[in-house]
Amino acid sequence: LIVKMLMRRVKFFRTEWFRKREAAIFMLGAAILFVIVIGIARNASSTSHFFTMAAGLLIEFALLLIAVLTSLLIRHSSKQINYGMRIYTPIMLMGLLVITFRIIFIPNSLIALVFPPLLVVFGFWQWASIHRNGPKVPKSDNSYAIASFVVTAITFAISIVGYSLLGLQVYIWWIFQLTVLQLIVACDDLLKQYRHKRVDILVRAYRLKHQNDVGKDKGSFILVTWLYDLVEMVLIPVLYLLSIPFCLYMASEVFDLTEICMDMFFYPFFNYEY
């Protein structure tokens, strides 16, 4: 009711930009509202350990969904946004099922029975989604969707040989990894927009002001591009690298395996004595 009233009275909600992104924006708003409501309920009933655990996992998933939707809204045009949502739907729904397995403490024997068929169903869905929507989204999203299909196939292979819990861990790690990659790519896209709108203008102004002192190489404009170059060449690659251990830790936290994860991080694999 509130949304309908806003759409009638606020001009922004009647613009073409909003209408073509309406589904993604509504989903984003619903996810944010869900996080707020569940967060308040979690703090209000802190005596129930089960509810606290379940609410925490659901909030984590909602935050992942918020990150993916935000990235799509930043990077995709009005013609691409719906296709982008469809191409990520299978992997996110399967991730919700995996988190549900953790919340309800489904027995290991039942996981071994149910998980592989679910992977087959969602794997075919992912492949069909890539085939239908892949050509209509940016290449990076198509690549991530293909990687999601490959991870699904690897998880199925792990599960079918009897390591279903390891398969769950691998799958939930990829969902965290995919989400962080989406955020980094979105930041990189915003950085490129900043370059076109601001840095290129500064470079042209600097070139006109110092015509006799500036060469043709890129390093000649370091005084005006140093911050952009620092973020683009150093910070973004470092974020990609650090995202791997971070996502491994977050995935291990879902299944209370953080102690094992930290032991692996700090294990002296190369311990040479002179």
Regions found by a protein language model. Name each.
Residues L1-Y274:
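Hydrophobic/aromatic interaction determinants used to assemble and anchor large protein complexes
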